[in-house]
Swiss-Prot record:
The keyword Transmembrane helix applies. May be part of an oligomeric complex which is likely to have a transport or channel function in the erythrocyte membrane. It comes from Gorilla gorilla gorilla (Western lowland gorilla). It is found in: Membrane. Keywords: Membrane, Transmembrane, Transmembrane helix. Its main location: membrane. Pfam families: Ammonium_transp (PF00909). This is RH-like protein ID.
Length: 417
């Protein structure tokens, strides 16, 4: 019988993290330089503001969104920040190396930092499926593999299907959810006997998670419009995302009350349902011609999110063989697929309306992009999950899942192990 005492990462974590940081520093020293061009000052400020919005979404929004677990709130917030900081550095280098041939010095611009932040967001979404089961060393491995897989997927899609930055990045929801669920499928699933309540939410952490959801709700229009080049497309993306998430809020509160026998609102449902519209319109936000369509999508997405939260967890966890505490499947993969379908429909209508006979080709291209993203996500996720199962990472014992005391010093508490 294995010991229930926590496995210390005192030597493993500093050695791994600091060695990696030193390697990244050397890579930045030899292979990068800042953009020396004279950019329009107004454009520079606008670009920085969008990047700032994305950083707030990543650090505060996703950081607090996963902090609702009883006994695991500290780790959720801090580990997300750690993954973000590491992921952005690696994504800047990777995007630079993959985007130029022959290889040369990587030019760092505000746009490249924005792109890297969005790539790192993929890891934060995926990590929701494994937080509580893994330690920081395992998360370091997950960050490196997922950012590499996402960057490779984007490069392949861009070269094969000739898509722009916005389109190949908006596969991020489906990609991140499939990657995270694949990793979770490979990890030990059941909580130890007597510790099943550790992945349940508590009142104060749940309020913190709602704070994260509010930050995401405010800045989601910036995320959906960040990579669009045309001012008209950016404007449409901002407007449509705002309408969609606004309707999602009304739907989430109303349907949550309707679903409870006594008409009470479930805060757990609220965390993700208020964001459902933003995920659903992400791919097609610049193509939606009218506010009412974005509002309908927000309504449908909110219904799917609430319905999934109420009906699917037990069924999906049992069928898929995972323990998806952060409900990744129906909050990102299902809504991401809905968004992809809506994009294909709008693209077909736009192509037919323009008298273009390439409708079938456009549909095949869109389906090909989505299929490739899913295949790469599932394959790389399975490989990552198998890699994280190696004993060298000193994974937490099942009895210490969702337990902050494994990783943090609590001066007012006894050790208790």
């Amino acid at each position: 019988m294995s010991s229930k005492y926590p496995r210390s990462v005192r030597c493993c974590l500093p050695l791994c993290a600091l060695t990696l940081e030193a390697a990244l520093t050397l890579l930045f020293y030899f292979f990068t330089h800042y953009d020396a061009s004279l950019e329009d000052q107004k454009g520079l400020v606008a670009s920085y503001q969008v990047g700032q919005d994305l950083t707030v979404m990543a650090a505060i929004g996703f950081g607090f969104l996963t902090s609702s677990f009883r006994g695991h709130s500290w780790s959720s917030v801090a580990f997300n920040l750690f993954m973000l900081a590491l992921g952005v550095q690696w994504a800047i280098l990777l995007d630079g190396f993959l985007s130029q041939f022959p290889p040369g010095k990587v030019v760092i611009t505000l746009f490249s930092i924005r792109l890297a932040t969005m790539s790192a967001l993929s890891v934060l979404i995926s990590a929701g499926a494994v937080l509580g089961y893994v330690n920081l060393v395992q998360l370091v491995v997950m960050v490196l593999v997922e950012v590499t897989a996402l960057g490779t997927m984007r490069m392949v899609i861009s070269n094969i299907f000739n898509t722009d930055y916005h389109m190949n990045m908006m596969h991020i929801y489906v990609f991140a959810a499939c990657f995270g669920l694949s990793v979770a499928w490979c990890l030990p699933k059941p909580l130890a006997k007597g510790t099943e309540d550790k992945d349940q939410t508590a009142t104060i952490p749940s309020l913190s998670a709602m704070l994260g959801a509010l930050f995401l709700w405010m800045f989601w229009p910036s995320f959906n419009s960040a990579l669009l080049r045309s001012p008209i497309e950016r404007k449409n993306a901002v407007f449509n995302t705002y309408y969609a998430v606004a309707v999602s809020v009304v739907t989430a509160i109303s349907v949550s009350s309707l679903a409870h026998p006594q008409g009470k609102i479930n805060m757990t449902y609220m965390h993700n349902a208020v964001l459902a519209g933003g995920v659903a319109v992400a791919t097609s936000c610049h193509l939606i011609p009218s506010p009412w369509l974005a509002m309908v999508l927000g309504l449908v997405a909110g219904l799917i999110s609430i319905g999934g939260a109420k009906c699917l967890p037990g069924c999906c966890n049992r069928v898929l063989g995972i323990h998806d505490s952060s409900v990744m499947h129906y909050n990102f993969s299902l809504l991401g697929l809905l968004g992809e379908i809506i994009y294909i429909v709008l693209l077909v209508l736009d192509t037919v309306g323009a008298g273009n006979g390439m409708v079938g080709f456009q549909v095949l291209v869109s389906i090909g992009e989505l299929s490739l993203a899913i295949v790469i996500a599932l394959t790389s996720g399975l490989l990552t999950g198998l890699l994280l199962n190696l004993k060298i990472w000193k994974a937490p014992h099942a009895a210490k899942y969702f337990d902050d005391q494994v990783f943090w010093k609590f001066p007012h508490l006894a050790v208790g192990f």
